[in-house]
């Protein structure tokens, strides 16, 4: 199957490896030529993300997946253009926008900094009928638990409760709130399987999960295996509210949004739906637990998880 990928971000690097392995042909939409992309089964198309520049590329693709993670209003405008380009394409009638976050079916406004730019795109998809689409929900990426050299996913430092660089854990809430974790490579494998599902079988939300746990248990595991002296502190809901009240910059507000993301329990993927989607869309995909991924890291400490 020929698949178009909008953007060459962190997740795209896993997609390039796993989609080719699954037998798909990829064309990466990018604003500038990237020599590292060129390999068997993968080509690139230079675009300025206008309808005219997308038309020829999408003409013979069956699916468009976006990994564009822009945090500005450009996210909204580019995704609206991608939707329109698919609608005008004779063949590309399936679209997956760049979500890949938490349980946005139940908590559509989490994290807060996502909502304003993502919701208009979701609404546009809901209000049309000539494209099949789905919003993929994965919880937290498990990759943040390994060093940066072992993942394509970039560091987010203090925005992740386990901060490798600072060698400390700052856990939002009680730390017992449920959180689901999924490895990025397994997400890519899941997407490669999802696009092979029969036409008309997609649902508005697709759920993946490698493991249901909580931040306290994950921090204890990291202390046990790698960082026995790592200090752990907790940030309460009240303290987070005070952070927001006293915030003088955007970075503080974003950090508070990350805290609320865990405290609200939005990071918990509905287990019944994850199980149903595993059977329906991913019957041959093994979603690794955190321990399984860390065991692979221990065995091959120079590999990309």
Curated annotation (Swiss-Prot):
The EC number(s) attached to this protein equal 1.5.3.7
Query: SUPFAM superfamilies attached here?
Result: NAD(P)-binding Rossmann-fold domains (SSF51735)
> What is the organism field in this record?
Arthroderma benhamiae (strain ATCC MYA-4681 / CBS 112371)
Q: What pathway or pathways are given for this protein in its record?
A: Mycotoxin biosynthesis
> What protein is this chain from?
Oxidoreductase swnR
Catalyses which reaction(s): L-pipecolate + O2 = L-1-piperideine-6-carboxylate + H2O2 + H(+)
* Cited function: Oxidoreductase; part of the gene cluster that mediates the biosynthesis of swainsonine (SW), a cytotoxic fungal alkaloid and a potential cancer therapy drug. Swainsonine production occurs via a multibranched pathway and is dispensable for fungal colonization of plants and infection of insect hosts. The first step of swainsonine biosynthesis is the production of the precursor pipecolic acid (PA) via conversion of L-lysine (Lys) to 1-piperideine-6-carboxylate (P6C) by the aminotransferase swnA, the latter being further reduced to PA by the reductase swnR.
* Family of the protein in this entry: Belongs to the NmrA-type oxidoreductase family. Isoflavone reductase subfamily.
Q: What class of enzyme is it?
A: oxidoreductase
